[in-house]
Amino acid sequence: QARAPLPPPTPAEPPQDKQAALLAVWNEARPLSGSPAALYLQTRGIPPAAFQTALNIRHCSALPLWATDTSGKPLLIGHFPAMLAAITTPSGQLQGLHKTYLHSVSGGAWQKLAACHPQTGEPSPAKKMQARHPAALKGAAVNLFPPDRQGRLIVAEGIETALAARALFGLPAAAALSAYGMAAFEWPPETLELFICADNDTSNTGRHAADTLAKRAITAGIKAQIWQPETAGFDALDELNRRKKTGSR
């Protein structure tokens, strides 16, 4: 006896697009100038000249911080000030938000939030990313500045690292947000030369990502060069603060 044919598989639902919700959060955020987020960057050692005209970076006075409770349900830890950054495509389409939660310390300085999970006591990450859908962040970045008139652009991993590289070298910068993001970075169409700032991490992950990006750029006809701090474990921000401390250049 012939078996009845199996029913067709249920088509997978497309991932929910959260862009409208992310845009609403972004549009409620305020300019960086004079905000706790600006004071946080200064506390990290970044001069205002490196970030005061930056694009795609704002301040939110009370951003919710969510975790997952022990039963797997969303758990609100609280509302905190935050530095908010828009993760975009080269054309400016919002793909996600990068959130750095903050708290004030003595002397008017601001630092990354030190919060704990209320049930487990484990530290809660002060930095979080939220994408519009699972595949949205590939190639996207926090495009802090467009390339200059010569088409030159710095690419670094972190936001603070990219701004520090701008302070070090005087060129516009973008933050790829991770080694994976650097390797997959999509440069703006007007880019003619990439200055890739690699973290000098012990795993060499940052250098490998920089090499991958450089090879992609050169294949596409874009000039590329890689800079890396000489000190093991350093990134551009560590190098900026070292030079300020020692008075070297």
Language model feature labels by segment:
Residues P15-K18, A141-V142, E190-L192:
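A short alpha-helix capping/helix-coil boundary motif
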Residues W66-P189:
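Phosphate-handling DNA/RNA-contact segment within nucleic-acid enzymes
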Residues L22-W26, Y101, A174, A217:
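Tryptophan-centered motif/residue detector
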Residues V25, N56, A136, G158, ...:
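Residue-level preference for alpha-helix termini and adjacent loops
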Residues A2, S124, N241-R243:
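Long, compositionally biased, charged low-complexity segments
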Residues G107, Q150-I154, I159-R249:
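TOPRIM fold recognition
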Residues Q1-M83, T88-S91, P147:
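TOPRIM metal-binding catalytic domain and adjacent DNA-binding surface shared by DnaG-type primases
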